[in-house]
């Protein structure tokens, strides 16, 4: 058992079809030294946030398995939801949990890049970003899935620094049309919460 602990938090673009969600989450189960801690679907966002934690090698294996299953089951051409997204696995951060585990997270990012980078457009963000201007997930995700085809085929794009993936085959095809693109990175622990406000006026909310 490794003394290093990390987690990955893949966000998948499916929050309504329980059969698909369960199949994707199950793909991350059954690996020694890691566990799925939570899977939190949101029907309005049509998105599920999944947390996998354990030893670096095991978390990586589980994450790669999950991404592969999501690529198989999610078709972004059928997706709609309230949350910004650009792919079937929209974002997959690796998070260091123990002292010295940051480097293990960086290695995990490189392994995901090696596994999927020849078939899926992958953007690196956060601590794994290849330039300061690419650290922000929001900047990389601008235009979302619907704008991806034009973005990657020399269409209008406001910021050339963020236009292209860090790795990709370079040819827009059926797999890209189904999956979209994915952001992978390293970030600290993030605490997020949502509040429901009983108010119809956005300004008042």
Identify the meaning behind each predicted range:
Residues 2-205:
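Long, contiguous binding/interaction regions
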């Amino acid at each position: 058992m490794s003394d290093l602990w990390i987690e990955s938090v893949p966000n998948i673009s499916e929050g309504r079809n329980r059969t698909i969600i369960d199949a994707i989450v199950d793909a991350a189960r059954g690996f020694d030294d890691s566990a799925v801690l939570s899977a939190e679907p949101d029907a309005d966002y049509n998105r599920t946030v999944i947390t996998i934690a354990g030893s670096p090698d095991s978390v990586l294996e589980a994450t790669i398995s999950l991404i592969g299953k999501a690529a198989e089951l999610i078709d972004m051409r059928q997706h709609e939801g309230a949350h910004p997204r650009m792919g079937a696995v929209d974002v997959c951060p690796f998070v260091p949990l123990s002292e010295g585990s940051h480097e293990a997270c960086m290695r995990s990012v490189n392994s995901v890049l090696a596994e999927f980078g020849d078939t899926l457009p992958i953007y690196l963000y956060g601590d794994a970003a290849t330039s300061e201007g690419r650290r922000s997930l929001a900047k990389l995700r601008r235009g979302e899935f619907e704008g991806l085809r034009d973005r990657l085929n020399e269409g209008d794009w406001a910021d050339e620094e963020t236009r292209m993936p860090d790795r990709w085959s370079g040819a827009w095809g059926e797999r890209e049309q189904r999956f979209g693109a994915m952001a992978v990175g390293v970030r600290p622990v993030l605490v997020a919460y949502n509040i429901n406000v009983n108010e119809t006026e956005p300004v008042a909310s």
